[in-house]
UniProtKB/Swiss-Prot annotation:
Region (Disordered): 260-283
The protein, known as: 1-deoxypentalenic acid 11-beta-hydroxylase
Gene: penH
Cofactor: Fe cation; L-ascorbate
Family affiliation: Belongs to the PhyH family.
Organism of derivation: Streptomyces exfoliatus (Streptomyces hydrogenans)
């Protein structure tokens, strides 16, 4: 693996070809769709996120989505922010469910746990506080591993604004060891990740700029990490949401049935519940 980023492959043309779509997913571990979601629904979620940041005192009342900036992601009361963003209206809208069902090829259940992100630019910082290491969502979420993560931007992203990089085909090796790495800290705590030296040269990192309405869907064992927001001239906000989808017939675990705030506000469940919504002793 190198730090050189290649583009995602746009899988939108495969949506009506079941065999080709499944073949691509099985080989690469992700599906990237351009403009598949209703842009008005995505815009509404972005405006709700802006409303929350203003109401909680982190943005000026006159701020718009085009001019928004905040001082710190971690300074915002994330549990309170969830009261403003009605993400389930987007995830479970009939037009969105149609996309999920086309991707999975069967009826789906959308997790009740959603992660929301609003990262300001950290231009000039070598190690922004909100970096995440290479990791697998399946390390934290279960017990079944047939879920897929769905990640969407609420505002346009770029190489400067960042987003999610996936390691092409890395899901095929199954679960990997996650080790505590002091370099990566969230809310003052070191978090676990997969050492870069564990990856082969064939597991190329992929990242593409995305627009509202685009969606990236990937395997529970897809290795992925954040690309930091280091945008400058102009600096921009990175606003995103992610959830998980799974076959409706599959077992529904803690993360599938528990809204993120209910887990995150329970300090006894540990720092990973604050980050992922999943209680775990692996910290």
């Amino acid at each position: 693996m190198t730090d050189t980023l290649s583009d995602y492959v746009d899988c939108t043309p495969l949506l009506d070809d079941r065999e080709a779509l499944d073949r691509f997913y099985d080989e690469h571990g992700y599906v990237y769709l351009r403009g598949a979601l209703d842009r008005e629904l995505v815009r509404t979620a972005a405006e709700q996120m802006l409303e929350g940041l203003i109401a909680l005192g982190h943005a000026d009342p006159a701020t718009t989505l085009d001019t928004l900036t905040i001082d710190s992601f971690e300074a915002v009361d994330e549990v309170a922010m969830h009261d403003y963003v009605k993400y389930d209206d987007l995830w479970n809208h009939p037009s969105t469910l149609k996309v999920w069902e086309k991707v999975l090829g069967e009826p789906v259940f959308v997790f009740k746990s959603t992660t929301i992100r609003y990262y300001p630019s950290a231009a000039g910082s070598a190690e922004p506080s909100f970096l995440t290491p290479l990791h697998q969502d399946g390390f934290y979420i279960g017990p079944n591993k047939d879920f897929r993560t769905a990640w969407i931007p609420l505002l346009p992203t770029s190489h400067g604004i960042g987003g999610v990089a996936v390691a092409d085909g890395s899901h095929k090796k199954g679960p990997r060891e996650h080790v505590v790495t002091e370099q990566f800290r969230r809310f003052g705590h070191a978090v676990r990740g997969i050492p870069a030296e564990e990856f082969g040269t064939d597991e190329q990192l992929l990242f593409s700029p995305m627009e509202p309405g685009d969606v990236l869907i990937f395997h529970a064992f897809m290795c992925h990490k954040s690309i930091p927001n280091v945008s400058a001239n102009p600096a921009g906000m990175r606003m995103s949401m992610d959830t998980r989808i799974q076959p409706a017939s599959s077992h529904r675990g803690f993360n599938a049935l528990t809204p993120w705030p209910e887990s995150a506000k329970d300090a006894s469940k540990g720092i990973l519940s604050k980050i992922t919504g999943t209680p775990t002793t692996a910290e």
